[in-house]
UniProtKB/Swiss-Prot annotation:
Organism expressing this protein natively: Homo sapiens (Human)
Lineage of producing organism: Eukaryota, Metazoa, Chordata, Craniata, Vertebrata
Gene symbol of the encoding locus: OR8D2
Listed name of the protein: Olfactory receptor 8D2
Transmembrane segments: 26-46, 55-75, 100-120, 140-160, 198-217, 238-258, 272-292
Gene Ontology BP term (one): sensory perception of smell
GO cellular component terms attached to this protein's record: plasma membrane
Length: 311
């Protein structure tokens, strides 16, 4: 590899998920199956919400965007990972590497803010039900989504711009199965101090601040739910929040474990395994989490299925 990333011929080798040849085929089949389920599940959710007249409230508007984002950031990583199970050397150009990192960051950061926006929607629905249609109007929801995507583009641009000016001359092997920030920083022979500061600040805002906002919202939500006198009302309110709380916990828990831990607390091999969870498993689980416990989604799916059978 060239001693600097400014050469058009600069290349990296992705170490991959495992170095054991006997696991290549089983892992390929496993992640291919997961990716197929992810694509079918998220595309199905998007089309179901778009075509069903029942799924018009703002929560489903946000859910369709969540499915889109899950589909996108999974597609940025998983196809390349599947291809890399085949050749012996998993070569990726510097431009392809930076592009992969850029789009991955856009969608992962956007998902964090989107989950926070969805939490605000639940807060208004439960704590301010009489004002819900006014506060969560279509215009407000559209503005919120514009902010979500804008923040994703902004922070991803900051990270990748700083990454693109680094020189990589120590090694050409990335100890990961995709181009993530931390493995790339370890390969740089120029100062990464600014990159590390940006990672800490931006990561703190994107993860810790949004997590805190979610926790505060849920404190108000649970307080309002406990004030409901009927058991049926409490059960229904808890049901509307449980799916989102599970999705939020899995996503932010995985991200926090990956990027906000002591450097020596785990090996790179363990980091690969944990990153698989939020890159491939979470996008597959989200449509299931939101549909299995949601009567409106299940009823809309049944209605659409019956309509096709009758036609």
């Amino acid at each position: 590899m060239a001693t600097s990333n400014h050469s058009s011929g600069a290349e990296f080798i992705l170490a991959g998920l495992t170095q054991r040849p006997e696991l290549q085929l089983p892992l390929f089949l496993l992640f291919l199956g997961i990716y197929v389920v992810t694509v079918v599940g998220n595309l199905g959710m998007i089309f179901l919400i778009a075509l069903s007249s029942q799924l018009y409230p703002p929560v489903y508007y946000f859910l369709s965007h969540l499915s889109f984002i899950d589909l996108c950031y999974s597609s940025v990583i998983t196809p390349k990972m599947l291809v890399n199970f085949v050749p012996e050397e998993n070569i990726i150009s510097f431009l392809e590497c930076i592009t992969q990192l850029y789009f991955f960051l856009i969608f992962v950061i956007a998902e964090g803010y989107l989950l926070t926006a969805m939490e605000y929607d639940r807060y208004v629905a439960i704590c301010r039900p009489l004002l819900y249609n006014i506060v969560m109007s279509h215009r407000v929801c559209s503005i919120m989504m514009a902010v979500v995507y804008s923040l994703g583009f902004l922070w991803a641009t900051v990270h990748t711009t700083r990454m693109s000016v680094l020189s990589f001359c120590r090694s050409h092997t990335v100890s990961h199965y995709f181009c993530d920030i931390l493995p790339l920083l370890t390969l740089s022979c120029s100062s990464t101090h600014i990159n590390e500061i940006l990672l800490f600040i931006i990561g703190g805002v994107n993860t810790l601040a949004t997590t805190l906002a979610v926790l505060i919202s849920y404190a108000f939500i649970f307080s309002s739910i406990l004030g409901i006198h009927s058991t049926e009302g409490q059960s229904k309110a808890f049901g509307t929040c449980s799916s989102h709380l599970l999705a939020v916990g899995i996503f932010f828990g995985s991200i926090t474990f990956m990027y906000f831990k002591p450097p020596s607390s785990t090996t790179m091999e363990k980091e690969k395994v944990s990153s698989v969870f939020y890159i491939t498993i979470i996008p597959m689980l989200n449509p299931l989490i939101y549909s299995l416990r949601n009567k409106d989604v299940k009823n809309a799916l049944k209605k659409m299925t019956r309509g096709r059978q009758s036609s």
